[in-house]
Amino acid sequence: MEKRRVIYILVAKTEQQELFYLTGQHDKQELQDIRNHQQFFCPSCEAPLLLKIGEINIPHFAHRTLSDCDHYSEPESSLHLQGKLLLHQFFQQRNFKVELENYLPEIRQRADLLIDGQHAIEFQCSTISPEHLQQRSQGYQRVNIQDTWIKGLKEPCNEGIGLLRLKSHEIAMQQKAGSLSFILLFFPPHNRFYYHSNLLFISSNRWVGKTKSIPAAKQAFPFAVPKPLSKAEFKTVMDIFKNEKKRYIRNQLYAGNRIRNVYCRLCYELRMDVANLPELIGIPVPGAQHFKEPVVLWQLQAVAAHEKKIPLRDLIRSGKLTLSAGAQEREAAAVLHYYLSCYSSFEGNALNDSSLLDIVYHNYCKTL
C-alpha cells in the first residue's frame, strides 16, 4: 500500500474564506493568539489544517490527518519551506506581484511561487522523475505560464570548473538562454543562488561544468545568465576530459575478454593502440548527452562509421549508438556531424595540448 504524505504548507483558508499566508509578517506570539481564535482549512481539499508553531521549525500548516491531497509538487521539508519564504521575499523586494502556493484549477497544479500571474517558480528539494517534471512543465504551458525550476541545496557547492555528478531530474531542470544551458540552484541557509553552467557530458551521470554563486541581494529577475567559458577555463575542462579518458581506457583494459569488449574491438578495427588513443578521441562536444555511450565510445563509433563511409543516420539506426531519453535522431546526427567535421579536419596531424585546445575551443565558441 502506498504511504500517504505528510504535507506542510504556508497558505491556508480561514473560516471567512480568506487566504492566510505564513510569510514572516507575524511573530510566534501573534501566531499563537491567531491560532486560538481561528480555524484553518486546506485551500485545495478543504480539510482542516493545524497551525504548527515550533521552537525549531518554521511555522507552517499541516493536515490534521495524513492526507491524500495531491496538488503539491513535493512533500515539504524545513529546507523547502525556508527556501520558498526567502524566494517570496526576493520577489517582493523587487516589487513583483508574488503569490505563494498558488493553485491553478485548470491544470490541477500548485506553483510554489507565481510571479505577476505568468511565471511559475518551482523550488524542488526532493527527487522528482524527469517525466513528472515534464508533465508539470507542460501543464504550465497549457495555461501560458512560463516555468522555472530551481534545485534546492542542502549544502553549498564547490565553485569553479570541475567534475559534476548530476541526476536525471537535475538535468531535466536545465534552462536555456540562447544556446547556453544551465541549472539554477538555491541554498536557503546562505540565501544564495548557484549555477551549474557550460555543462559537457562525459558518461553516465558524469559531467564537466562551471559552478558559480551569487547572493540573493545581487540576483536579478529575470534571473542572471551565466557567461560562456574563457579559453583559460576551457583548458581546465580539457584537462578533466583527458584524465577521464585515461580512467575510461584503464577500466576497459582491466575488464577482461577483449574480444567481446566493444571498445577494444573498435580500436583493433581502426588500428589504434588500445592504451593510447589519438588526441581527437574523447574530447568535449556540446550535445554529447544525446548518446548514452561514454564520450570515448561514441566518438570511436563515429570515426569507424566515417572510415567505412556509413551515413550517420544509418549508424544511429544500427543500434551501435543508443540515444538518451527524449533525444531526437536529427539532433544526434548533428552532434556526430559536428564532431566528425572537427576530427576529419585534423586527422593524421600531430597535435600538442596547445593546438588541440585551440581546435576544440574554437569549435565550442561556434556553438554559442
Task: Set out the residue ranges of the language-model regions.
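N-terminal cysteine/histidine-rich coordination modules
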Residues: 1-96
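Short acidic/glycine-enriched loop/turn segments that link adjacent beta-strands
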Residues: 57, 106-109
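Conserved catalytic cores of phosphodiester-cleaving nucleases, focusing on short active-site segments
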Residues: 87, 111-129, 140
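A short acidic/basic microdomain associated with nuclease active sites
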Residues: 88-107, 116, 124
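Catalytic cores of nucleic-acid endonucleases
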Residues: 125-180
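A conserved mid-domain beta-alpha-beta active-site/ligand-binding segment of alpha/beta enzyme cores
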Residues: 169-228
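Long, charge-rich alpha-helical interaction segments
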Residues: 224, 229-244
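Extended, amphipathic alpha-helical scaffolds
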Residues: 249-368
